[in-house]
A protein has these predicted regions:
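Hydrophobic or amphipathic alpha-helical targeting/insertion segments
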Residues: 94-118
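Generic recognition of long tandem-repeat/solenoid scaffolds
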Residues: 31-37, 54, 86-93, 106-109, ...
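Short, surface-exposed loop/turn motifs at beta-strand boundaries within globular domains
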Residues: 26-30, 35-39, 47, 83, ...
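Broad, structure-driven detector of short, well-ordered beta-strand segments within folded domains
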Residues: 42-46, 95-100, 191
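Catalytic-domain carbohydrate-binding cleft regions of carbohydrate-active enzymes
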Residues: 114-559
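A low-complexity, Ser/Thr/Gly/Pro-enriched, surface-exposed linker/loop concept
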Residues: 26, 30, 45-88, 126-129
C-alpha cells in the first residue's frame, strides 16, 4: 500500500480550504437550500417572501410527495444566504430562516430579527413502521413556543376551546369534528403540517408537536403575515382562493330530517311564500331514493312518494327558490352505482353507515367520474341546484387495521383526512366542466386545508340540541375559519333534539331554537335542520308570538 507524507504546510492548507465552515454541508437550490443533517435530507424552500416550506426525510428515502392541499408553486423570491457559526441563514424581505447544520433545528424570525418560532433541537423524528406490506414512518415534528403565546386553528373541534395551548387533540375526521393540522399564532405566523394521516397535536410546557401515523417526510409550511388577516391571506395564496357563491345561497335555508314526499317539500316552500317570510333554499335529506337500505344512496329518485322529481324542482324554481339534495359517498349493494363501482374494484372495504353499504375510492379518477356521472344524469340534468355531500369524512366504524388497505393514492391511513377535499373538489370540477350556467354550491360535513377553493360550505355535523353545544359552536366555527376556510354553519336548533322530548311544543326548546337562529343569522349559511322535531317557522306559533316575530326578524336581516 502506498502512503503519502503529510506536512504541516499541507495540513494548514487543508484547514484553510475547510474554513467556509459548513459551506460543503449544504447547497443552494433555485428557491432555497438543501442540506444533509443528522441522517436527514433537509430542504428549505421559499414559496414567496412570506411563505417557507420545510421538507425533512431520512437519507435514502425515495418518495414523491403529492399535496392535496397546496396548489402554489415556488415563486421567484429574492433572498440572501449567509453562514453563521454552525448555521446557515436565509433571509427574504419578510422573514429570516436559520438552519442549524448540527441539529437540524430550524428557527424563524421577522426581517428585523425578532424571534417568531423555533423547532426543538432534534425535534424531527422518524420511526420506521409497517402497515401490512407498506413500510413507512411515524413522523414527528416538535416546536418551542413562547410561554404566553396563544395559538388558534386545528379546524372545527367540539371541546369548546378557542386557544389551543395545553391541549392534546387527535386529528382524525369524524362526524362533527373537522381536523386541519394548522395553527395560527398571535405573533402573526402560522404553520400548516401537510400530512393527511391521523395525527396527534400536543401542546404542553415542554413542546408543541405534530405526531402523524404515516408519512415519508416531515413537510410543513411556515407563513408570516404579521397579523391574522395577513396569515389567512398567506394560507389562501398557498392553498387556493375562496370562490364566491351565488347570491341566493346567502339567504335562509329550510331543511329537516327528512321531507318524506314531494308534496311535503313543496308545501313548505308554499307556506313560506304565503306568510311572506323569506326562503331561498329547501333541502331534501336522505331516502328520496327509497327506504330499503339495499337502495341506500342510489343517487337517483326511487322513492314512489317522489313521483316526478324534475317537476318538483321546476315547481321550486317557479316559487323563486332553490333546491339541493343529500348525496353520500357510500352506496347500498342493490344500487346501479354500487354495482358499477364494485365491478371495477373501485370500492373501499370497511364498515360505514349503513353497514350494508360501501364507500367509493374517491382517490381514483375513474371512481370520481362514475360518481359524477350518476349525479349529473339523475339529479343535475333534472334541475338540481347544488349538493349536500354528507358524511364526507367518510364514516368509519371498523377496526384500525382497515386503515391499512390500499387506495388509488396508496395506503388509506396515509391519505385518510384528505378524503373530503378530494371528493368535494371532484364534484366542483366536474360540474364546472359540464356547465357554466350555475355556480357550484356544495354543503359538506367534512373538510381539509384548501377546501375554500371549491366554495364548499362546511357544517358542524350531528350535534346535540343543548345550550352548552351551542356555546361550543362559536370557538368551533372561529377556529375552522382561521384555517382559511370561511364558509361554515351549524344545524340551527341542533341536530339531535332528544334532550327535549316534546320538541317544538316545549317552550324551553323554542327559546333555544330562537337563540340559535340569532347566532345562525351571522354565519355564512343560515340553515335550519335537525331530527326529532320539525323547525319550520309556522310551527313555532302564529304571527305575533315572540318566537315567530323574532325568527322572522332575523331571517329578514339576511336580506
Amino acid at each position: 500500500m502506498r502512503t503519502k507524507k503529510v506536512t504541516g504546510l499541507t495540513m494548514l492548507f487543508l484547514a484553510l480550504i475547510a474554513t467556509p465552515l459548513w459551506g460543503q454541508s449544504y447547497q443552494k437550490t433555485s428557491c432555497g437550500i438543501k442540506a444533509n443533517v443528522c441522517s436527514m435530507n433537509v430542504e428549505v424552500q421559499f414559496y414567496s417572501p412570506e411563505i417557507v416550506r420545510i421538507i425533512k426525510s431520512p437519507i435514502g428515502t425515495d418518495f414523491v410527495k403529492k399535496s392535496f392541499s397546496v396548489i402554489k408553486t415556488p415563486e421567484e423570491t429574492d433572498y440572501s444566504v449567509r453562514e453563521q457559526n454552525d448555521c446557515v441563514v436565509l433571509k427574504s424581505k419578510a422573514v429570516e430562516i436559520t438552519l442549524n447544520l448540527k441539529t437540524g433545528k430550524v428557527a424563524y424570525a421577522d426581517a428585523k430579527g425578532n424571534s417568531l418560532l423555533t423547532e426543538k433541537d432534534y425535534g424531527t423524528q422518524f420511526t420506521p413502521v409497517a402497515y401490512r406490506e407498506c413500510e413507512t414512518y411515524l413522523v414527528r415534528q416538535a416546536f418551542m413556543l413562547d410561554r404566553d403565546e396563544a395559538i388558534y386553528g386545528l379546524g372545527q373541534l367540539q371541546q369548546g376551546k378557542m386557544n389551543q395551548r395545553n391541549q392534546m387533540v387527535h386529528l382524525r375526521n369524524v362526524n362533527s369534528t373537522i381536523c386541519i393540522p394548522y395553527i395560527q399564532s398571535i405573533k402573526g405566523y402560522s404553520v400548516f403540517w401537510d400530512n393527511y394521516s391521523p395525527t396527534t397535536f400536543t401542546d404542553n410546557p415542554m413542546e408543541t408537536a405534530f405526531d402523524s401515523q404515516a408519512g415519508d417526510c416531515a413537510d410543513y409550511y411556515f407563513m408570516y403575515g404579521e397579523n391574522a388577516d395577513g396569515v389567512v391571506r398567506c394560507m389562501r395564496d398557498l392553498t387556493g382562493q375562496v370562490q364566491m357563491n351565488a347570491l341566493w345561497t346567502y339567504g335562509f335555508w329550510q331543511s329537516r330530517e327528512r321531507y318524506q314526499s314531494q308534496e311535503e317539500l313543496l308545501d313548505v316552500v308554499k307556506k313560506y311564500r304565503e306568510l311572506g317570510v323569506p326562503l331561498d333554499g329547501i333541502i331534501q335529506d336522505w331516502q328520496y331514493w327509497g327506504t330499503d337500505q339495499k337502495d341506500w344512496n342510489a343517487v337517483e329518485f326511487g322513492n314512489p312518494l317522489f313521483p316526478n322529481p324534475q317537476k318538483m324542482m321546476e315547481d321550486v324554481h317557479k316559487m323563486n327558490a332553490h333546491i339541493i339534495a343529500s348525496v353520500w359517498p357510500s352506496f347500498g349493494n342493490n344500487t346501479n352505482i354500487y354495482k358499477e363501482l364494485n365491478s371495477k374494484n373501485l370500492l373501499l372495504d370497511f364498515k360505514t353507515f349503513p353497514e350494508s353499504a360501501k364507500v367509493y375510492d374517491t382517490f381514483n379518477p375513474e371512481a370520481r367520474n362514475i360518481y359524477w356521472d350518476y349525479m349529473n344524469k339523475n339529479l343535475f340534468a333534472k334541475g338540481m341546484d347544488g349538493w349536500w355531500l354528507d358524511a364526507t369524512e367518510p364514516e368509519f366504524f371498523d377496526n384500525d387495521d382497515k386503515l391499512n388497505q390500499k387506495t388509488y393514492a396508496g395506503l388509506y391511513r396515509k391519505v385518510f383526512n384528505a378524503f373530503p377535499i378530494v371528493s368535494v373538489g371532484s364534484v366542483y370540477d366536474h360540474q364546472r366542466a359540464v356547465s357554466s350556467d350555475k355556480r357550484v354550491f356544495i354543503l359538506t360535513r367534512s373538510a381539509f386545508a384548501g377546501q375554500q377553493r371549491y366554495g364548499a360550505n362546511s357544517w358542524s355535523g350531528d350535534i346535540r340540541s343543548t345550550w352548552d353545544v351551542l356555546r361550543k359552536q362559536i370557538p368551533a366555527g372561529l377556529n375552522f375559519s382561521i384555517c382559511g376556510i370561511p364558509y361554515w354553519n351549524t344545524d340551527i336548533g341542533g341536530f339531535h333534539a332528544y334532550t327535549y322530548p316534546d320538541g317544538i311544543k316545549d317552550p324551553a326548546y323554542r327559546e333555544l331554537y330562537v337563540r340559535w337562529t340569532q347566532f345562525g343569522t351571522f354565519t355564512p349559511m343560515m340553515r335550519s335542520h335537525g331530527t326529532s322535531t320539525p323547525r319550520e317557522i309556522y310551527l313555532m306559533g302564529e304571527k305575533g308570538a315572540w318566537e315567530f316575530n323574532t325568527l322572522e326578524k332575523y331571517k329578514n336581516l339576511r336580506y
